[in-house]
Amino acid sequence: MADSREENVYMAKLAEQAERYEEMVEFMEKVAKVDVEELTVEERNLLSVAYKNVIGARRASWRIISSIEQKEESRGNEDHVSSIKEYRVKIEAELSKICDGILSLLESHLVPSASTAESKVFYLKMKGDYHRYLAEFKTGARERKEAAENTLLAYKSAQDIALAELTPTHPIRLGLALNFSVFYYEILNSPDRACNLAKQAFDDAIAELDTLGEESYKDSTLIMQLLRDNLTLWTSDTTDDAEDEIREGSKQESGDGQQ
């Protein structure tokens, strides 16, 4: 007998507590692939957190290995560089597999089944996030360009709905603005567009702060703080390595929470 939806959700929560995120992904994928009804807010957040942790560990590994590779290259240690490159390529294969998995699920199930503006923006933002993660490490000009174009398309689709349907203080709309601005800054090397987008989102939210409901107050104000942190970083005379401190969404906010 197939596992019930409730049992898979429970097992996903259990896996999260045990920090077994690959298994958490498996349980939530089972839930997402059942075409009975779309995911609840709790279920989509569980899926998001599962994938965020699985991809986050590899993204961190890739950054560390890439940094070591650059240092060894500058020292002329060719033997070490060769070994490091092999290891980096292995991590990149894992990153690609993870991104392909969630992007396939978004394409086949999650985006088509989304019935509310909130869920549509949530999943389109998620789609943009995982295309962005591909763009972070793809070195081939064609592959990187394709990943960047797909990111832009998904974020713009999400933005169109968010601006029309969600309030400026909605955590999912704010989370989208946060990650979209990071994309402009890091992937497209467009600091002006990044700052404009982040500032507009922050200012629009500030103007309607008194309408913010208690339930989303914590999530919304956290993302606003991250937007402000990035604006401070991007508009100050910082060194290149300060980019490492660019802030994205937190672990488990309503706005998906990618980093």
From Swiss-Prot:
Gene Ontology biological process terms in this record: protein localization; signal transduction
Compositionally biased region (Basic and acidic residues): 247-259
Annotated tissue distribution: Leaves specific.
Gene Ontology cellular component list: cytoplasm
SUPFAM superfamilies attached to this UniProt entry: 14-3-3 protein (SSF48445)
Coiled-coil residue spans: none
InterPro entries for this protein: 14-3-3, 14-3-3_CS, 14-3-3_dom_sf, 14-3-3_domain
Region entry Disordered, spans: 237-259
Source domain of life: Eukaryota
Cross-referenced PROSITE patterns: 1433_1, 1433_2
Family: Belongs to the 14-3-3 family.
Name by which UniProt lists this protein: 14-3-3-like protein
Originating organism: Solanum tuberosum (Potato)
